[in-house]
Curated annotation (Swiss-Prot):
It comes from Saccharolobus solfataricus (strain ATCC 35092 / DSM 1617 / JCM 11322 / P2) (Sulfolobus solfataricus). The keyword Oxidoreductase applies. This is Ferredoxin--NADP reductase. FAD binds at residues 33, 41, 46, 86, 120, 281, 324. GO terms for molecular function: ferredoxin-NADP+ reductase activity; flavin adenine dinucleotide binding; NADP binding; thioredoxin-disulfide reductase (NADPH) activity. Binds 1 FAD per subunit. The lineage of its organism: Archaea, Thermoproteota, Thermoprotei, Sulfolobales, Sulfolobaceae.
Length: 332
């Protein structure tokens, strides 16, 4: 059985930075992620959106940010497992931890849980034809803008993501239509105002059925939820943007103290389990407001790894020093 100083659970920004920082502290590291691609929400939800709230970057495409984080995480040669779900953790008699996944079992001295909202699962409407044409015209996010060039696009939803996708695709699509089941939007006012300028908008409307020729989407049937009157729209793509569900799997059964969906940690990012730490969107820090920001998660990761290093090696310094002064970063 492979043995590690630390196992990082979650391959989003916080887990990736934690993996880098563990390598920086000379810890033998394993990173496990349930998705088939590292990067978390940056890659799976909004790869082409611009992220502005990471220090030192005035604006960077989410996918590019993810690639930089992945490159950084790999600097010290960690083991990385993707498409592998951490299923259970167990304490051993020799004060170690066993991490069981759906594919293997690992032994580690410490664990850093950076699972975000969990495995990302799109919310589905349940409309007729939705599942049949999934990934053949029915989508739940926009991975690449160019896939919708010249297409007649129908977007379902009334939140920031739905409105943002409409604004993003309007310049390249043949047409963009957005339907929302209410007349109030959960999006920025300026964006909603622009939406009505660049797209066809139907409020009080819902999706009833997606139709196609067996290979691709050709039409969508929508209806007014007040009058029940139906309309048939000729479309090439349907984007259902009504949110995502985070599947935490068995994490609530691991024995960590939780508050709702959050793992409770102290200022040292320690859970109630010795040697188990957590950070990022999945935590609620005692006495601190919860801010779902990448920048906050980076700080969580640095603190958690530093405390874990001292747990593994009690004589180690809590502070690693400034990277600009480390020999490992100096030109050879």
């Amino acid at each position: 059985m492979d043995e590690y100083d630390i196992v990082v659970i979650g391959g989003g920004p916080v887990g990736l930075f934690g993996t880098f920082y563990a390598g920086l502290r000379d810890m033998k590291t394993l990173l496990i992620d349930a998705q088939d691609e590292l990067g978390g929400q940056l890659v799976s939800l909004y790869p082409e959106k611009i992220v502005y709230d990471v220090g030192g970057l005035a604006g960077i495409q989410a996918y590019e940010l993810a690639q930089r984080l992945i490159e950084q995480a790999k600097m010290f040669g960690p083991d990385i497992k993707v498409n592998e779900l951490a299923d259970m953790i167990e304490k051993t008699n020799d004060n170690m931890w066993i991490v069981k996944t759906d594919k293997a079992t690992y032994k580690t001295k410490t664990i850093f849980i950076a699972a975000g909202i969990g495995k990302i699962v799109p919310s589905r409407l349940g409309a007729k034809g939705e599942i049949e044409y999934e990934n053949r015209g029915v989508y739940y996010t926009v991975r690449r803008k160019k896939d919708f060039e010249g297409k007649r696009v129908l977007i379902v939803g009334g939140g920031d993501s739905a409105v943002d996708w409409a604004l993003t695709l309007a310049p390249v699509a043949k047409s963009v239509t957005l339907i929302h089941r209410r007349d109030q939007f959960r999006a920025h006012e300026r964006s909603v105002k622009e939406l009505f300028r660049v797209a066809n908008v139907y409020v009080w409307h819902e999706l009833k059925e997606v139709k196609g020729d067996g290979n691709k989407v050709t039409q969508a049937i929508i209806f007014d939820n007040r009058t029940k009157e139906e309309k048939v729209l000729d479309v090439d793509s349907v984007i259902i943007s009504i949110g995502y569900k985070g599947d935490l799997g068995n994490i609530p059964k691991w024995g960590v103290t939780m508050k709702g969906r959050d793992i409770v940690v102290n200022g040292r990012m320690e859970t109630n389990l010795p040697g188990v730490y957590a950070g990022g969107d999945i935590v609620q820090m005692e006495g601190s407001p919860k801010l779902a920001l990448i920048a906050v998660g980076f700080a969580h990761a640095a603190i958690a790894i530093s405390v874990a290093k001292k747990y593994v090696e009690p004589n180690a310094s809590l502070f690693a020093g400034h990277s600009s002064e480390m020999d490992k970063f100096k030109p050879k």
